[in-house]
């Protein structure tokens, strides 16, 4: 018989997550897990792919998949068009949540916090290392706006290519980076019988508090 959605499941038995072996702050654990994901989640899977959830001014949630482009003790960095739908949502409510899922490792990381724009210098530095086509696309595409058809987009790209025929495209003012400043990071490790390990880090005035959550 064909498998139904109700029948689709897998058991997890690869590893565990113990408080005694976990660091007191979350960033070193994220770096460790991400390094392991880089080794196991082979292309075409992108280990730095994440879902990013935002909320608009009416309280309606929106979610999409983006690529993480930087992480340090300040937070998690991604780039976008500031005039896009997500840009408008972050302007109205500067908070977001992101989730990484690495199925080979049976792991998930959830991150929540306030979002700020990175400096123009950071945005420009990243923009300059992007492929030429991506840089031209940032100028050409009116992201999230309704367009007539694919032909209109190709026409906009052709105009942009003509504009920058004799010069390298610089970072447009409507494009740049955001940094999510985490106040909560949860590490999830799949375990047998759905009794998963969940270690949650929440930021308090005195620093990070580590706690185990029931699955």
Swiss-Prot record:
InterPro entries cross-referenced by the UniProt entry: Pyridox_Oxase, Pyridox_Oxase_CS, Pyridox_Oxase_N, Pyridoxamine_oxidase_dimer_C, Split_barrel_FMN-bd
Q: Which one GO biological process term can you cite for this protein?
A: pyridoxine biosynthetic process
Q: Which domain of life, per UniProt?
A: Bacteria
Q: What class of enzyme is it?
A: oxidoreductase
User: Which UniProt keywords are given for this protein, alphabetically ordered?
Assistant: Flavoprotein, FMN, Oxidoreductase, Pyridoxine biosynthesis
- What's the cofactor? FMN
Provide the assembly information.
Answer: Homodimer.
According to its UniProt entry, the function of this protein is described as: Catalyzes the oxidation of either pyridoxine 5'-phosphate (PNP) or pyridoxamine 5'-phosphate (PMP) into pyridoxal 5'-phosphate (PLP).
Family statement drawn from the similarity comment of this UniProt entry:
Belongs to the pyridoxamine 5'-phosphate oxidase family.
This chain belongs to the protein called Pyridoxine/pyridoxamine 5'-phosphate oxidase
- Lineage of the organism: Bacteria, Pseudomonadati, Pseudomonadota, Gammaproteobacteria, Pseudomonadales
* Gene behind this protein: pdxH
């Amino acid at each position: 018989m064909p498998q139904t959605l109700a029948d689709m499941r897998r058991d997890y038995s690869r590893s565990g997550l113990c408080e005694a072996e976990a660091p007191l702050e979350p960033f070193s654990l994220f770096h460790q897990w991400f390094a392991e994901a880089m080794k196991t989640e082979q292309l075409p899977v992108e280990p730095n792919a994440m879902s990013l959830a935002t909320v608009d001014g009416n309280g309606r949630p929106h979610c999409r998949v983006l690529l993480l482009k930087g992480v340090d003790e300040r937070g998690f960095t991604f780039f976008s068009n500031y005039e896009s739908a997500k840009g408008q949502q972050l302007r109205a409510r500067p908070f977001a949540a992101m989730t990484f899922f690495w199925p080979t490792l049976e792991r998930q990381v959830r991150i929540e916090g306030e979002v700020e724009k990175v400096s123009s210098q950071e945005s420009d530095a990243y923009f300059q290392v992007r492929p030429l086509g991506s840089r031209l696309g940032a100028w050409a595409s009116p992201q999230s706006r309704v367009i007539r058809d694919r032909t209109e987009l190709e026409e906009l790209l052709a105009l942009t290519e003509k504009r920058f025929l004799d010069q390298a495209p610089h970072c447009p003012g409507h494009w740049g980076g955001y940094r999510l400043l985490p106040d909560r990071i949860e590490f999830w490790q799949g375990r047998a019988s759905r009794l998963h390990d969940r270690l949650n880090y929440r930021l308090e005035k005195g620093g990070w508090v580590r706690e185990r959550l029931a699955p």
